[in-house]
Every structure is written in C-alpha cells, then in structure tokens.
C-alpha cells in the first residue's frame, strides 16, 4: 500500500460551508481508543500539557500514542529526550512510497512506553499542514499501529482553526483547550470553540473542557466558562519545575518529587488523565461574539 499526497478535496460540506480537509472513511481511528485533540493559543503550553498528559496516561497503565501536528516538530521531545524525524521528512526520503517504510522509521518510543510521532509539515507558506496530519494517520493505519492503542493525543499547532489544522478534530472524541487567565488566550479559546461547533455537526468530536495553564488565578477563565458552558478540567500554576523540565528535555514525571511543586503537578496530571478515562460528559458550549468577549473580560 502506498501513501500518495494528492490535493485535498474542496467539497463544501463541513461547518459553515468553508473549504476543509475531509476525513477519508478508511482513516477512522478504531473504536475503543480515547482520542484527544489539544488546542490553544500559540505558546500557551500545549506541547508541555500534551506530553505530561501522555506520561500520566502511561502511568495509569494505558498504551499511549502522541502525534505532534506542528511543522516545528517539537511536541514530543520531552518524552523521547530528542528531536525525532518527521513523517513528511521520512516519506520524502522514499519518494512517498510508504510501503518501503518500517514502523521504527517514524514511530519512536518515549518515556514509560509512550509512542511518539511528529507529522511535520510543508515549508512555511506552502501546502496544508492539516493534510499532512491526515497522511500521518493513514500511514499509522497502514502499519496497524493504532490497533493496540488505548489513548491517542493530537498536539495541534497554535490556535489555527482553518480546515487543515482542524483536521485532528475529525478523529477526536474530545478536545481540550489550553489557556491562561488572560484576554488573548481566552479570545483564542473562543475561536477554537467555534471550530469545534462546526466540526461537531459532522464528526464525533466534543468539547472535553479547559486546562488552565501558567495561571495563579482563574477568575477570567471562570467568567468565560460560566457564559459559554465550558468547565476547567485542570489548573496548573506557574511552577518553575515545569519550565525546568522543558530545559532538561523530560516530562514532569521525571523530575524529583522533592522539588517545590513537582508532586502537586504530577497529581494534577494524573487526575486529569483519570477523569478523561472516566468518560467525561461532553460539553455543549456556545461561543461568544468578539465584542461580547471584549465586554465580558477585565476588571470593573
């Protein structure tokens, strides 16, 4: 079987009539796996959250696959302790003849058995990164690498909600949105809610909730949640050990528990993972208009 990159369909069936990358029915991830797409404003800590959440699931005995969906391919380095080659780079080496590849060419084992894939993407300003994500899922299925997986986490580029980078929503059961307690992060979160509302018309994805990150307080997030119907699933304060874990190229679970804040962060990730496994009730949130967010947030 050969993976061939072909132009994505321009059918207008999804969301509000936008041109989007559509899921081939054959690419559906097997029922039984918990599939989570992690979104949020660029630089908010999605890769940190995704990797530590993957590690937490593995600590609970689950078989985990994390798929980095960013051309920077830096999603999984705290799990693998290195920058791994991307799927698109490996495919280019074999002129996109996927039958020449072995799983070990593009899937790398990380901390506590977490399997890691970096989809990569086209050069800046060209192509569709979301379509590359679709090809990554296709390649994983060709090699039967999704059949024995309990949890799949898509770590998605920034807050881009075009048809391409909304593609992981087509595979996901739940979307988690990482945000801080500030206007820009919450504004981006609202746009992501809009994208999920569009995808939920045709796909199974639903909102799982919000991860408050690098925030001492959550008052602004709480305001937004109350108005839209969202909920906060986990709260991570600005703990220096998290920053240092990135510099050490490891997950928070590899840091010394005696360091300040480490054990509390580990426990919060384990609680988040367990709550997601317990089939969290999906949310029917309603996004706000831009002006409504502007008027809602801030101090009296």
Curated annotation (Swiss-Prot):
Q: Where does [4Fe-4S] cluster bind?
A: 128, 162
What CDD domains does UniProt report for this protein, alphabetically?
A: Bchl-like (cd02032)
> Which amino acids does the record list as binding Mg(2+)?
47
Query: According to its UniProt record, in which pathway does this protein act?
Result: Porphyrin-containing compound metabolism; chlorophyll biosynthesis (light-independent)
The chemistry this enzyme catalyses reads:
chlorophyllide a + oxidized 2[4Fe-4S]-[ferredoxin] + 2 ADP + 2 phosphate = protochlorophyllide a + reduced 2[4Fe-4S]-[ferredoxin] + 2 ATP + 2 H2O
Q: Name one GO molecular function term.
A: metal ion binding
Q: Which PROSITE patterns match?
A: NIFH_FRXC_1, NIFH_FRXC_2, NIFH_FRXC_3
Q: Which Pfam families match?
A: Fer4_NifH (PF00142)
Q: What function does this protein fulfil?
A: Component of the dark-operative protochlorophyllide reductase (DPOR) that uses Mg-ATP and reduced ferredoxin to reduce ring D of protochlorophyllide (Pchlide) to form chlorophyllide a (Chlide). This reaction is light-independent. The L component serves as a unique electron donor to the NB-component of the complex, and binds Mg-ATP.
Q: Which family does it belong to?
A: Belongs to the NifH/BchL/ChlL family.
Q: What is this protein called?
A: Light-independent protochlorophyllide reductase iron-sulfur ATP-binding protein
Q: Which organism is it from?
A: Synechococcus sp. (strain RCC307)
Q: Gene of origin? A: chlL
């Amino acid at each position: 079987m050969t993976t061939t990159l072909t132009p994505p369909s321009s059918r207008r069936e999804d969301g509000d009539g936008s041109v989007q990358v559509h899921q081939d029915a054959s690419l559906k991830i097997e029922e039984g796996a918990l599939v989570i797409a992690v979104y949020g404003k660029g630089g908010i800590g999605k890769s940190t959250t995704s990797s530590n959440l993957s590690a937490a699931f593995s600590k609970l005995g689950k078989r985990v696959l994390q798929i980095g969906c960013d051309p920077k391919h830096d999603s999984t380095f705290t799990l693998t302790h290195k920058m791994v080659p991307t799927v698109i780079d490996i495919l280019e080496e074999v002129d996109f003849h996927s039958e020449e590849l072995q799983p070990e060419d593009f899937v790398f084992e990380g901390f506590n058995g977490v399997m890691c894939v970096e989809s990569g993407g086209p050069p800046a300003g060209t192509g569709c990164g979301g379509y590359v994500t679709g090809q990554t899922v296709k390649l994983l299925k060709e090699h039967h690498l999704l059949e024995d997986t309990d949890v799949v986490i898509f770590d998605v580029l920034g807050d881009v909600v075009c048809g391409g980078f909304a593609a992981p929503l087509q595979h996901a059961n739940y979307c988690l949105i990482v945000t801080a307690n500030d206007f820009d992060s919450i504004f981006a979160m609202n746009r992501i809610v809009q994208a999920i509302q569009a995808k939920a018309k045709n796909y199974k994805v639903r909102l799982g909730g919000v991860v408050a990150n690098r925030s001492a307080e959550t008052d602004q997030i709480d305001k937004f949640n109350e108005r839209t119907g969202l909920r906060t699933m986990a709260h991570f304060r600005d703990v220096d050990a998290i920053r240092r874990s990135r510099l050490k190229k490891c997950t928070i679970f590899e840091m010394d528990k005696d360091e300040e804040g480490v054990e509390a962060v580990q426990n919060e990730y384990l609680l988040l993972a367990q709550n997601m496994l317990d089939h969290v009730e999906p949310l029917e949130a309603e996004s706000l208009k831009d002006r409504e967010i502007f008027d809602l947030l801030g101090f009296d």
